[in-house]
Structures are given as C-alpha cells and as structure tokens.
Amino acid sequence: MSLPEAASAAAAMRQINQAWQTGRLDELASMLHRGMVMAPPGFGGRAQGRDAILAGFRDYCENARTVEFNEHDLQADVIGDVAIVTFRYDMVYERAGARSRASGRDLWVLQKHSGSWLGLWRTMFDMEEHPS
C-alpha cells in the first residue's frame, strides 16, 4: 500500500463528508460513481445508483441540520485503484424540531478514476442513536 495513496483516499473521504454536511450536493455528485451502491445498516435492502444515493443525502439536507460532526479513527487501505476507508463518527443533528445524537462506523469503498477517488459502495454499522 502506498502511504501517499492512502492519505489521498482519506482526504477524498473528508471531502465527501464536508460536501454532504454543507449541502453541496452537486459537488458530492462529482465524488460518487454513477453505479454506487449503499447497503443500509443490517443489509436490509439497498440503494443503487448515484441518483438514489444523492436522494438520501438530499432528504437529509432538506429536513435536518448538522449541529456537530466528528470523525475519528479514520483508516484507509489502498490496493491498486481501490481504497477501503472506514471511520468512526459522532454527530448531533436536528430534524423536525428534535435534536438527536448518533454514532457509529462508516465504511466506504472508493475507486480511482482519472486521478480522482469516487465512492463505489457504502455501509454503516455499530450505529447508536438517541435524543440529545
């Protein structure tokens, strides 16, 4: 694994997180592969395709507000043109007048296309959520 490539994949993951947190969905779209898949926690169903993934982020951006988002324990492993990036997160958000605290682990598979990392696949696990 190339350390510069791992650092590059980690930086791409941070850019993805910043884009959805600030509602920059056009920018986020440019960081997702058109065939991206999201397997929700527990793997019950799936969202397939960039438009479906963006719809989930759009719903969040239109109906919730991120108060606080912290990522930690970010690890990126790169093999060839594929990166597996995982991180723990803690966040506080407001939705429908209620404040909630959520935590868990996010796992993304990224692939390098024309010099840029694109999201291919995502899931979340170890999730906990409760009123804040």
Question: Where are the model-predicted features located?
Answer:
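A solvent-exposed, acidic/Ser-Thr-rich amphipathic alpha-helical stretch
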Residues: A6, A10-A12, L25-V78, S100
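Generic hydrophobic alpha-helical segments
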Residues: Q15-I16
